[in-house]
Amino acid sequence: MGKLATYATANKVVAVFQKRESLNKIEIKNRFTIVLDDLQDPGNFGTIIRTADWFGVENIICSENTVDMYNSKVVQSTMASLGRVNVVYTDIFNWLSEQEKVNIYAATLHGKFINEINKPTEGILVIGNESKGIKDSILQLAGEKITIPKKGHAESLNAAV
């Protein structure tokens, strides 16, 4: 186990997963999908995968520059959710441009408060890079910019939130 692990204290569990669906097999109608625009932190990515699994989000579409889903920190922080959520890498600008019948929401610092929008039953949520946010070209494809209302004094939220 020590040879397989990248941490000083290796877990005593090994898992084998079949690689997930290709992009053309992913169904987005009547469900929520997460799109990641150049997310870099493995811990954030793992947390997003785990949270997606908790809420029943089946698909995460990643830009080609998003951290590798098989990074050891990503895998560990998913707590096995990686085996239940489809993660696919593609050119997200082109992919989003093709999604004409599904609402695209961009998670931004300055947008409509999430508690002020009608509760959608489907849609695509775009989450940006931890330091740069969502690229302007991707933002232009979003029908609505949304944010979580701020109560305290923190400058921003972690991308995984």
Task: Enumerate the predicted regions with their spans.
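Short, acidic/turn-prone active-site loops that include or flank metal/cofactor-
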Residues: 1, 65-67, 92, 130-132, ...
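Arg/Lys-rich RNA-binding interfaces used to dock onto structured RNA substrates
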Residues: 1-41
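Short, charged, surface-exposed secondary-structure boundary motifs
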Residues: 4, 95-96, 155-160
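Short, hinge-like loop/turn segments at secondary-structure boundaries
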Residues: 11-13, 77-81, 122-125
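Conserved beta-strand segments that form the floor/walls of ligand-binding pockets within enzyme
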Residues: 14-16, 34-35, 61, 105, ...
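RNA substrate-binding interface of SAM-dependent RNA methyltransferases
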Residues: 25-111
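Structured adenosyl-cofactor binding patch, chiefly the S-adenosyl-L-methionine
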Residues: 51-55, 69-83, 136-161
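Active-site/ligand-binding-proximal alpha/beta "capping" segment
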Residues: 106-154
